[in-house]
Amino acid sequence: IIIGSGVRITRNLTIQCANRVQIGDNVLIASDVFIIDYNHGNSPLTKNYRDNPLNISVGGVTIENGVWIGNNVIILPNVTIGEKSIVGAGSVVTKSIPAYSVAVGNPAHVIKHFDFEANIWIED
């Protein structure tokens, strides 16, 4: 787990890391956020699912500089959240989010991106 400088974390952040979780500089993480970089095995051939091995080869999580993660967000393995993006409250991040985007929902999807020429957020 690598946490950059100027990161602000409120209460109840859970990070489950078997590979690599990297949080860039000046990231804001709201309450009750869950980050995991692996999956639990799901073979029905074992006695119970608890006995399945972890799939630690899935891939890490990267949260780039200046990102804002809202309350109750879940971030799943093998994703990058691009620089200065915003992830709305209650979202489940299952795939990477481009830089300078706003993503919401389950699964999280981009609803806005920042237009540097117009200097405004544009709806997608």
Describe the residue ranges of each PLM region.
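C-terminal/domain-terminus segments
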Residues: N78-H109, F116, I120-I122
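Flexible, glycine/small-residue-enriched loop-and-beta-strand segment within the central core
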Residues: I1-V79, F114-D115, I120-W121
